[in-house]
Amino acid sequence: MFEKDKWMTIGEIVAPQGLRGDLRIKPSSDFPERFTKPGKRWIQKTDELPTEIKLTKGKLIPGKSIYVLSIEGVSTRSSAEEIIGWKLVIPIDSRPMLSKDEYHYHDLIGLEARRGPSKALIGYVTDLIKGGNDLLEIELVEGKKVLVPFVKEIVPEIEIKEKWLLINPPPGLLEL
């Protein structure tokens, strides 16, 4: 039986590339080998069971955050177009171990966001936006979404097992 929490999305198929069935992938993983090293992977249509595939080759497009992958059995542009929007997934237990202050994207989404010494609930983490400085998107309890720099000075404590993180925002940050 399919269990959603046993799989982790590492990318999304966003477009075909060329006429031979190659696929453009928008990654949501910081591990390039997931897109470049040949081997077993899975693709998944929303709310369906993942389907095992074989990645035959992959490369990063220079200057862009897009990978081009070749998958066994997808050899025409039309067959590539059929799976646009599908996710590239891996079993969650195949995640690499991280050092003390590193976190998997999947583990941060859904965490309670708490504030200050009282650790009062202020909202929930809804996204992590990658960039020069990563940003946590937090939906506040009143429904407004705010972006918080994901740095130790502002997010000093993260308790993955207890499903919360602490935010000490500078004055005015949550009012923007």
Curated annotation (Swiss-Prot):
Keywords (alphabetical) are: Chaperone, Cytoplasm, Ribosome biogenesis, rRNA processing
GO biological process terms, alphabetically, are: ribosomal small subunit biogenesis; rRNA processing
What the entry lists under Pfam families is as follows:
PRC_RimM, RimM
Domain (PRC barrel): give its ranges.
100-173
Q: Which GO terms describe its molecular function?
A: ribosome binding
Q: Does the keyword Cytoplasm apply?
A: yes
Q: Where in the cell is it found?
A: Cytoplasm
Report the domain of life of the source organism: Bacteria
Gene Ontology annotations for the cellular component aspect, listed alphabetically? cytoplasm; ribosome
Decide whether keyword Chaperone is in the record: yes
Q: Name the job this protein performs.
A: An accessory protein needed during the final step in the assembly of 30S ribosomal subunit, possibly for assembly of the head region. Essential for efficient processing of 16S rRNA. May be needed both before and after RbfA during the maturation of 16S rRNA. It has affinity for free ribosomal 30S subunits but not for 70S ribosomes.
Subunit record text: Binds ribosomal protein uS19.
Query: Which PANTHER family does the protein's record reference?
Result: RIBOSOME MATURATION FACTOR RIMM
Let me see what the UniProt entry remarks about domains. The PRC barrel domain binds ribosomal protein uS19.
Name of the protein in its database record: Ribosome maturation factor RimM
Classification from the root reads: Bacteria, Bacillati, Cyanobacteriota, Cyanophyceae, Synechococcales
